[in-house]
Amino acid sequence: MSWWWAGAIGAAKKKLDEDEPSQSFESVALIIGVTGIVGNSLAEILPLSDTPGGPWKVYGVARRPRPTWNADHPIDYIQCDVSDAEDTRSKLSPLTDVTHVFYVTWTNRESESENCEANGSMLRNVLQAIIPYAPNLRHVCLQTGTKHYLGPFTNVDGPRHDPPFTEDMPRLQIQNFYYTQEDILFEEIKKIETVTWSIHRPNMIFGFSPYSLMNIVGTLCVYAAICKHEGSPLLFPGSKKAWEGFMTASDADLIAEQQIWAAVDPYAKNEAFNCNNADIFKWKHLWKILAEQFGIEEYGFEEGKNLGLVEMMKGKERVWEEMVKENQLQEKKLEEVGVWWFADVILGVEGMIDSMNKSKEYGFLGFRNSNNSFISWIDKYKAFKIVP
């Protein structure tokens, strides 16, 4: 049985066959956003000995110098700012052996029109630096997300689809940088008839990356650690409807597995796929798990005290500095490890459920237990000394 069918945490065999002699590579991956929450999972899974389509050679691209928590992955790390067309061309066009592109990065701007411009330009820069120069290019994976059906974060009162979300739902008649990215992908990829594509739309992602702009698990770990340090109850900062309502999440390893499946399986070509754990949960249940993982006895939802993390974490910078020193954590500022605005968005809504039927019908049967997934990523933030 393929590891993407196993559905367990760590389904991909986390083992490199170090004793094998050097070998030629069947596939060559280029991960754009390798230090991000899914990029980090791709960098761990692609080089494994049993990964489909392999053996894989892996290039990993990120804007910043390589962090210590990413350093063990056997990849060729390239520091490159893909928002800079010249930097992108000079560093990526020499990679003539690339066969597969995994585009899993994004940037955030103040308005959606600026998001469309910035994110569209980044994707175009990458594709124009690779497509004309990589004669063996076979496939491009583009990661977007559930906002395809909801619109941008600012679309509070605007049009949105009713869940469960399915891939055949039409685009909303609003600006959305995901739509811009799709259009650019289609425009650039049609220049080479032999290159195929897939689009992946994960829900809220459970994964590991201190650099991620949408890092819900890491952010909640930091909040819980501060509550534990101060002896405060772990109060749910979001809305009652989010506390009580059904939600779904996407394990970062599962997303990586789906992208690899789509990259190598002929039945998955030129299609868009939702990606979630194929189960549902309530925050009221995960909150108990979060409290247990940090040894907090008093926790829950209290009406009137759900002020949001942006408000609740004001003035906690000195507290975090003390915690970093006391626990010998990685020296990161509070604003680097706690994405409060994003957590407030996520913990203020409910019912963002998308269907996995299409993905299963096409042959991807991977899944995760969201409770176990949540715990496994909490453990990783502790192991890498992001939180105590």
UniProtKB/Swiss-Prot annotation:
Optimum temperature is 45 degrees Celsius. NADP(+) binds at residues 35-37, 63-64, 81-82, 105, 143, 178, 205, 212-214. The active site is at 147, 178. Gene3D superfamilies: NAD(P)-binding Rossmann-like Domain. GO terms for cellular component: cytosol. It catalyses: 5beta-cholestan-3-one + NADP(+) = cholest-4-en-3-one + NADPH + H(+); 4,5beta-dihydrocortisone + NADP(+) = cortisone + NADPH + H(+). Induction: Up-regulated by wounding. Not induced by drought, high salt, low temperature or herbicide treatment. GO terms for molecular function: Delta4-3-oxosteroid 5beta-reductase activity; enone reductase activity; protein dimerization activity. SUPFAM superfamilies: NAD(P)-binding Rossmann-fold domains. Its EC number is 1.3.1.3. The keyword RNA-binding does not apply. CDD domains: 5beta-POR_like_SDR_a. One of its GO terms (biological process) is xylem and phloem pattern formation. Homodimer. Involved in vascular strand development. Catalyzes the stereospecific conversion of progesterone to 5-beta-pregnane-3,20-dione. Can use progesterone, testosterone, 21-acetyl cortexone, 2-cyclohexenone, but-1-en-3-one, ethyl acrylate, ethylmethacrylate, cortisone and canarigenone as substrates, lower activity with 3-methyl-2-cyclohexenone and 3,5,5-trimethyl-2-cyclohexenone as substrate, and no activity with canarigenin, canarigenin digitoxoside and pregnenolone. May be involved in the formation of 5-beta phytoecdysteroids. PANTHER family: 3-OXO-DELTA(4,5)-STEROID 5-BETA-REDUCTASE (PTHR32487:SF0). This is 3-oxo-Delta(4,5)-steroid 5-beta-reductase. It comes from Arabidopsis thaliana (Mouse-ear cress). The gene is VEP1.
